[in-house]
Amino acid sequence: MTSTLAAPRQAASWMTDDVAAVANLARDFFTRYVCPQAESAAREGRPDRELYRQAGEMGLMCMSIPEEYGGGGGTFAHEAAFLTEQTLAGDTSLHLGVHAVIVPHYILAYGTEAQKKRYLPKLASGEWISAIAMTEPGAGSDLQAMTSRAVPTDDGFSLSGTKCFISNGLNADVVIVAAKTDPNARGAGISLFIVDVTERSAGSDPVGFSRGAALRKIGQKGQDTAELFFEDFPVPADAVLGSLNGGFAQLKTQLATERVILGVAAVASMERAVELTVEYTKQRNVFNAPLFAMQNTRFELAECATIAHVSRVFIDQCISALVDGHLDVTTAAMAKYWLADQQCAVIDRCLQLFGGYGYSLEYPIAQMYADARIQKIYAGANEVMKELIARTL
């Protein structure tokens, strides 16, 4: 079961005719190609990588990347429409926010011309799948505590370390890896590298690089999440992304976009939850009357619908600011933490109205409940977001 709600419910300044066309195309893509494979993706712990190629053929990848690098030449508004439709369709298997938005914009912002020409067209086509590896077993929200090392060699660097909870980790061909190039410094000693693992021998990853098994998660089970291991993995000198030891500043800058991406999903998820619950409560009879006729049900849904509407106004403001180049780190942090909190709360309240059926994965609301919980954790835990906001007060 998927929602028929078009995204977004309220017309926004960023929802131009061409962006609306992207939303319609994305809705067709998820309905026809992705959702029918949801069960197989959940069993395998990863989606079929051919879906990335399919999205590329339909022009749905890297839409905010310039056309000269294989992208669509659009703005973040096009990406937001696409990601909204993904959430409304109920898909969490394709981590397209990472592959088609986050990683390409790191390369666009900090990459050399050679790096842009080598990687961006193949990411846009879906031929290569991308990931970004920041988190480590002992360094989650505190990225400055990472211990992965990139030691200089005669022709580049030798990379060693473990990265965990990496979205697209199993399917990735290209990984942006954060590692210490100055072990005596914290954030000032972090550099970013474009690590190319496309060269495989007999189906195996290159020497010095390996992947763990798909992580068993409580939600988003079809989404590819894995550990990555580097052991004296050779990285050429021209793989440095941006300035040496400038990686932490680059991460802080780009994380604002990532947090808005999570906000986009949070709002669409709330809208979907409300719609599914209204539909269910109007069909479900209790005490010889529709559940929707009960005052408690109506009040609960009225409050949830209001929260979803206010959240839509907030995320529309963030999307417009990002499109115009005016989004600030503090507002992005506010959006990430508050919208994630509201998403989890609204889905929980909606699930309650399903009664015991809400605890069954046969009903989408149960899967939404499990899928939503990570929103408070990744891209910076909500507690960290509050600290970032407090520093500006």
For each feature predicted by the language model, list its residue ranges.
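Alpha-helical interface subdomain recognition
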Residues: 1-89, 93, 110-115, 122-127, ...
